[in-house]
A protein has these predicted regions:
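Active-site beta->alpha loop and helix N-cap motifs at the rims of alpha/beta catalytic domains
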Residues: 2-146
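C-terminal alpha-helical cap/extension of soluble enzyme domains
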Residues: 4-14, 33-40, 200-203, 210-301
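Generic structural "secondary-structure junction" signal
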Residues: 14-18, 54-55, 113, 141, ...
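A general structural signal for well-ordered alpha-helical segments in protein cores
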Residues: 27, 60, 64, 89, ...
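Alpha-helical structural signal in soluble globular domains
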Residues: 62, 66-71, 95, 99, ...
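Short glycine-/small-residue-rich flexible loop motifs, especially phosphate/cofactor-binding loops
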Residues: 93, 124, 195, 259, ...
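Catalytic alpha/beta core domains of metabolic enzymes, predominantly
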Residues: 128, 142-249
Length: 301
């Protein structure tokens, strides 16, 4: 299978005003920035970092329309169409396809904790309901369900399920999925602190939230590791980037820190929507120091 999707994709933030209304103008401008200046190969609105769970159906549709309009076909837009039931997710997925999405990002339904067999039937129904590629999103830390390699192998037999974003944090998963599935499914790194390891094991892409704040560094790391196979140079850059990635993943406030980092790097995207809150002064000060250290470490590189 030739890969339609590869490279660095943003798990796109959803900009908000100070009143926690979706800021569609900033969303369009930010999407354009990520493509034109950041050099990203794709965008994914309505993922975890995009706070899809906090948006109304009308807002979700408007976010997709705004992102597609801003992108104007320059890069693929995969839309997160997650929800609580198969019926609801099919409706979101069909809507995204109709609006012009290039693909879908699908996690396990939240809260209900379906079994592997129930998950297979769930994803098969979605697969049969749409005609665009599906990227599975395995993030048991958020869904409570781990889509293990044997289930991924079964799902890879379905026509539209062609990718998986692997976010377990298990360093063996990328190689195990590739060993089992071969060319039937392509793996995207979904755990920032295992990015280089994932690329060395055969991942063809990277979906990240921190990429919103540091797009050029992410793209450069991917180029060094995947395009150039220059793992020595990639490792040097990766070790400089790791303190930022580790802080974001380990703080327990991922979306909050990503939005704060965007503002610190000159692209304010507003606060998260409650119940999430903007980071406090102490956290913001620490984040600012980490970002400044990274800037100094890569200056001139």
């Amino acid at each position: 299978m030739d890969s339609l999707f590869e490279g660095v994709y943003s798990a796109l933030v959803t900009p908000m005003t100070v009143d926690e209304e979706v800021d569609y103008q900033t969303l369009g401008e930010f999407a354009n920035y990520l493509i034109e200046e950041g050099g990203l190969q794709g965008l994914i609105p309505l993922g975890s970092t995009g706070e899809y769970y906090a948006l109304s159906d009308q807002e979700r549709e408007a976010v997709v329309k705004t992102t597609l309009a801003a992108t104007a076909g320059r890069v693929p837009v995969l839309v997160g169409t997650n929800g609580g039931s198969t019926r609801q997710i099919i409706a979101y997925s069909r809507q995204a396809e109709t609006l012009g999405a290039a693909g879908l990002l699908l996690a396990a339904p939240y809260y209900s904790l379906p079994t592997p067999d129930e998950l297979y039937r769930h994803f098969k129904r979605i697969n049969d309901a749409v005609g665009i590629p599906i990227m599975l999103y395995n993030y048991p830390g958020r869904t409570g369900v781990d889509m293990k390699p044997d289930l991924i192998e079964r799902l890879a037999e379905l026509d539209n399920i062609q990718y998986v974003k692997e976010s377990t944090g298990d360093a063996t998963r990328v190689s195990e999925i590739i060993r089992r599935c071969g060319e039937q499914i392509k793996v995207f790194c979904g755990c920032d602190t295992l990015a280089l390891e994932s690329f060395m094991m055969g991942a063809v892409g990277w979906v990240g939230g921190v990429v919103n704040a540091l797009p050029k560094a992410h793209v450069r790391l991917f180029e060094l590791a995947v395009d150039n196979k220059d793992f020595m140079a990639a490792r040097k850059l990766y070790y400089k980037l790791l303190p930022v990635l580790s802080l974001m993943e380990g703080a327990g406030q991922y979306t909050q820190f990503v939005k704060a980092a965007c503002a610190m790097n000159g692209h304010p995207v507003g606060p998260p929507r409650r119940p999430l809150c903007a980071v406090g002064d102490e956290e913001a000060s620490h984040l600012k120091k980490i970002l400044a250290s990274f800037d100094m470490a890569v200056s001139g590189v």
